[in-house]
Amino acid sequence: MSDVRLIQVPWYLGREHPDLSRGPGVLAEAIGAETVVVPGPEPRPVPNEVADSFDVIRSVRSAVSEAVADGRFPLVLAVNCFTSLGTVAGVGRDLGVIWFDAHGDFHTPDSTPTGFLDGMGFAMLTGDGWQEMRQGLRSVPVQNSVLVAARDLEPTEVARVEARALRRADADTLEAAFDVLATRVDAVYVHIDLDVLDPSVARANVLSVEGGLDVAQLEEALTAIQGRFEIAAAALTAFDPSQDPEGRVPEIAVTLARRLAPEKVAS
């Protein structure tokens, strides 16, 4: 696995979380590859969740950029999905995005009912919200993005998805969506929030909801992506080991890592 670099990001909104912060390390141990850990933000006189989170995003950008420069495939293991901004920026070239998630992560400060920053990750990546904080980070045109297997969205989020014409797909329609995306981009960032899995298969976190993908469906989706695109970087996010007492998620993560970079990850 010498061509893969695992980039652990064990920070939840810029801070340590008693359960979620363990997730990246557990996944890294299961996958087994060269690993770096992204440092947390410098302490501030007055804690600032947003500023701390963007500090982490920029640290991810640096770690991914270094991996690419070293000829390594960057596989990010993160708590928060908004780390995707750092990953795409670190790759340093135009990419499409394929986003697997039970949720849309497509809110902005104007649409969110909760103010939860990680519920805005995909929206920020496609150019909406927090413009000043995003300075110097890349955005991806929404028409170069696909949201897969999302099934738990608030009404205001659904309205935003429709207004922005974000392409959505499920297990039955994802190949057609990938075909359309392949007419626009050659390389993609693949984002897998592990709660895309149906909780009957494995419960990734407390936000897991029924109606998700099984492992075979997710493997088939990744094979379809490999057949159409270069995968420039990928992420596995939002794993809470306290919700997975049987240890199913790390085993699945190994399978997914092999599908994401089959020529780079040993069997």
What does each model-identified segment do?
Residues S2-L75, T87-G90, V158-S267:
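Catalytic cores of soluble, metal-dependent hydrolases
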Residues I7, V79, F100-A102, V148, ...:
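Active-site flanking residues adjacent to catalytic metal/cofactor-binding acidic residues
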Residues V9, F100-A102, G127, A150, ...:
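Cofactor-binding loop segments of dinucleotide-utilizing enzymes, especially the Rossmann-like FAD-
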Residues G23, D118-G121, P141, E157:
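Internal, well-ordered alpha-helical segments in soluble enzyme and binding-protein domains
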Residues D70-Q135, N144, F229-A232:
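Active-site histidine-anchored catalytic micro-motif
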Residues F82, H103-D105, R151, D195-L197, ...:
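Catalytic metal-binding/acid-base residues of hydrolase active sites
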Residues T108-S111, M133-G136, T156-V161, V201-A202:
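A short secondary-structure junction signal
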Residues R134-P155:
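Phosphate/diphosphate-binding glycine-rich loops and adjacent basic-rich segments that engage nucleotide
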